[in-house]
């Protein structure tokens, strides 16, 4: 049996390492929010990004000294630059988590619903993951995770 080129590490193992800067796209709700809270409790500095500025600001109130925020929409062309700005604001990045995807039941197969889903889950994914991967490649590595 061949070994996989991918290394899967348990979350608790990641938290025990010296890494301490994470960026989470989609941290204002759901799994992204739970991961952000867990990382904060482990002493991490985090950068969070999402579309709703008010939700980002509300979340930052939990631990203002540990949280940087950036409003961005992964479907917009400027989102890669905004992610770069958040990385810079945080002073670097050791872990990147993309937790922003959408899905709808579309029983009538309305084209705009499907196109919006593709813009978020394909185009947005590509923008964010490419930006994070480029940062890690140029800065000696890191961990990239997608939900």
Segment roles from a protein language model:
Residues 25, 93-101, 146:
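Rossmann-fold scaffold of SDR-type NAD(P)-dependent oxidoreductases
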Residues 28-29:
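Conserved glycine-rich cofactor-binding loop
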Residues 63-78:
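Rossmann-fold cofactor-recognition segment
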Residues 97, 128-132, 136:
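Hydrophobic positions on the long internal alpha-helix
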Residues 111-129:
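Catalytic Tyr-X3-Lys loop
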């Amino acid at each position: 049996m061949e070994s996989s080129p991918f290394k899967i590490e348990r979350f608790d193992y990641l938290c025990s390492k010296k890494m301490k800067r994470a960026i989470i796209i989609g941290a204002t709700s759901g799994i992204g929010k739970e991961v952000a809270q867990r990382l904060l409790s482990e002493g991490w500095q985090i950068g969070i990004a999402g579309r709703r500025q008010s939700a980002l600001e509300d979340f930052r109130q939990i631990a203002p000294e540990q949280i940087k925020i950036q409003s961005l929409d992964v479907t917009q062309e400027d989102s890669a630059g905004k992610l770069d700005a958040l990385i810079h604001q945080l002073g670097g990045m050791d872990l990147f988590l993309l937790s922003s995807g959408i899905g709808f039941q579309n029983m009538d197969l309305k084209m705009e619903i499907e196109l919006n889903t593709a813009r978020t889950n394909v185009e947005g994914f590509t923008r964010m993951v490419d930006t994070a991967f480029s940062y890690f490649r140029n800065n000696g590595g890191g961990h990239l995770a997608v939900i």
